[in-house]
């Protein structure tokens, strides 16, 4: 009869005659419902079956092949693979895996390579040397060879019943490590107190597309006491998160160009500080600068902007420096007036408040901010700070005068963010903070 005919069939995986499987294992990924990789349970209510009259004509998988594949995958996910989950803990809809067939430990492709014991670095050359050293130590510690293999895969569950392989790649370990190092060497920026480092892929996605939400977090107060603290964090919709994490992973592993749509989202948000609190906006600016540097490197426009001299002849870059200088002068006034008070941290400067207008009409907006500074702030800060401000503004304007007059008020390119960040970082270096002793 029909049932006995189908008991044995050609396994389309192994190419051998075997007992075919009607129902394949489910729940391959823990906490992911009953999602199946292979499912053919549609005797009625199906959408489209093409030319097939029954489900067995589409494919047949033998019992041995099915058990080997599903058990190996289940073991990889639980034991050997480097997992990066996307979604809530109770239902992780997407799982990224990275493993070596010989069981050797590999670096996490979704994370930056870091040396936990290293001091924060401020010089790009020191950062790249540390990156090379970290990679060499990792290879030595885990006995990695150039001929070893790295396998990357991602699994996505659109529903609780269906699981799909959305990405699969096999590359040599030499290529894999080179691309990990190349990404971290160029998609990086000054991250405040952490020094120069590359943002994680999830951090980039959250900065580009996350909405700001409030979260209650327990923080330690003293040796034994804890307190509830309300903080703002960036949280991205799961569907958006899954899509763009996949794009970034493809770019990082395959050595592709940094996605232009993600870069555009980052730079637009970096020009909208009013939508975020101070801490989250700074994270977005840092991520935008890292992404911009990587994109310029990928498209052969640059890629080593952190090593730029402050007198670089670029209009947008110099306007960014000017923005940071005006912000610094006003912050100096707030620090003096509200020293140690919450008002010092909460007050937003005019330079940041007008940043959108500044990007569209830099020259006229500069005049407006500078006028506010002269009338309300410069006379109330330390003399050496006022002298430093006037000196820097004079230097920057002398460079800008070298450009045609009709270009001075044209909209700025994204490079103004880099000029702003590099000048702001220069204000907080030891060299700059000690300059006042000489100027006094």
Q: Where are the regions that the model predicts?
A:
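Short metal-coordination and nucleic-acid-contact micro-motifs, chiefly zinc-binding Cys/His arrays
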Residues: 3-9
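Protease-labile, long low-complexity intrinsically disordered regions enriched in Pro/Ser/Thr
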Residues: 8, 17-18
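Short Cys/His-rich metal-coordination motifs, predominantly Zn2+-binding knuckles/fingers
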Residues: 14
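Extended alpha-helical scaffolding segments
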Residues: 1, 18-440
